[in-house]
């Protein structure tokens, strides 16, 4: 069990809002009929993709962030290795656990790990730079509230977890909706570090672009090899070679940079749970 000081807010969303369907009607390639600039006009329920003021991703930098050394929320992780499946959804590769792979606990509420997936290049920018890849760890409570943790990667040494499942990725690379067992996977193998992280209110990065999702983005950047990036990219179907939404305007939102260590105590800051605004 690992205990981290953290403040996170959540939004109740339907499972369809996680872009879990493979019958997608949006693309990423600029100039296409369904590229990100046109998402808001494809469906009425996607209008907020163009009109929303709290859209994601954004550029994260200390210059726009409020530094926080302590918060009033405690996040505890209780992960365990269980059998998992890798699925090619066409627009990304998703890891889904067949049984209970554990949870995070915040404010005495359990949030079960639902799935993990990758975007390449990264969706969030760090100090003005779009990195090579971004991992999303999605957790959900029984009430439907989400807690999403994003981990950024730059090109460099191979990522240990992706190396472990490379042969499985190859196996379903050309199979739409293809699934393959990847054995027992411990979520801790993804290797994220919560000693320093950004948080802000944003949205889903895919339609319907629902707002008031609180993003927690790890400041420590991992590495992934060029070969691994190419394998994941090549596995996606046309229009999804780069499955990253462009950066969205900040529109005056507060961004917090939580640093776990401080030479002197700082006032504790409570971030209210997301609600109607």
Curated annotation (Swiss-Prot):
Binding site residues for Zn(2+): 117, 119, 136
Tissue: Expressed in flowers and siliques.
GO terms (BP aspect): response to carbon dioxide
Free-text description of this protein's post-translational modifications in UniProt: N-glycosylated.
Induction of synthesis: Accumulates in low CO(2) conditions.
GO cellular component: chloroplast stroma
Signal sequence range: 1-19
Residues that hold substrate according to the record: 205-206
Role summary: Reversible hydration of carbon dioxide.
Protein name, as recorded: Alpha carbonic anhydrase 3
Source organism: Arabidopsis thaliana (Mouse-ear cress)
Upper classification of the organism: Eukaryota, Viridiplantae, Streptophyta, Embryophyta, Tracheophyta
